[in-house]
Amino acid sequence: MKDMTETDAQPRIAVLCSGGLDSAVLLASEISRLSVAQNKRACIQPIYVSSGFSWEQSERTCTQKMLQLAPFVGEVEPLAELECPITDTYPEAHWALTGDAPAYNTDDQEVYLIGRNILLLAKVSAYCAINQLEQIAVGPLAGNPFPDATPEFFSAMERALQEGLDHTLKITAPFRSLTKEEVIERGLDLSVPFQLTLSCMDPVDDKHCGRCSKCRERLQAFSRAHLDDPAPYAFRPKNPNTGR
């Protein structure tokens, strides 16, 4: 494996950023962690990966706005935007491409995007090897039911990527034991601008639709944390449990 040089001794990490609540708090948390551990600013590279999904334009817009505010501005590198198209792999009628998002009460298992994390990590790891970044931080939470979000998966991917790239690279999932409401509480402590985060599969003018299952997940987490979600909604359910 190729090691970091003396001049690159400070931490150099990539953080996958989707513009959503979890990745925003993850980025802020990494800034905080490294500022405490280091005497000088670490290289923290936020990365957004486009795959051709219908919600991505709104995600990018929100991410760019968010990074212009504390606690991010002046603390991270400019957003790196990579492309990893999946439109030639998924059927043309797939809901993630058409914008026909799963309904509010859809089970989490039904929104699994096959191969999503495999493709993301493959693309981002090549970027990391080229740019001498030594860690990728990702944001799955406790209870994530998908096979490409388990500790075993991340360990296996880490080994394969290090071997294939001949580059020392760690994959970390710091929030793997946290619930979404716990992530919200951490984000409050870190002054994350939740009003600019977007966790929606069918945004309307860069606002949450309030009708998809990602909006349900977000609204219910804020409700369990006894907080109002400050982000804008095209439709905001009065009851987060029913979506009405």
Residue map of PLM features:
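Short Fe-S-cluster ligation motifs
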Residues: 216-244
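Amphipathic, positively biased hydrophobic alpha-helical segments used for protein targeting
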Residues: 30-31, 35, 135, 198, ...
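Local cysteine-cluster metal-coordination motifs and their immediate loop/turn environment
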Residues: 122, 198-220
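Charge-dense, low-complexity polyampholytic segments
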Residues: 136, 201-207, 227-235
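A short alpha-helix-loop-beta-strand transition element characteristic
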Residues: 191-197
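ATP-dependent adenylation/nucleotidyltransferase module used to activate substrates
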Residues: 2-191
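Alpha-helix boundary/capping detector
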Residues: 154, 183, 213-214, 238-242
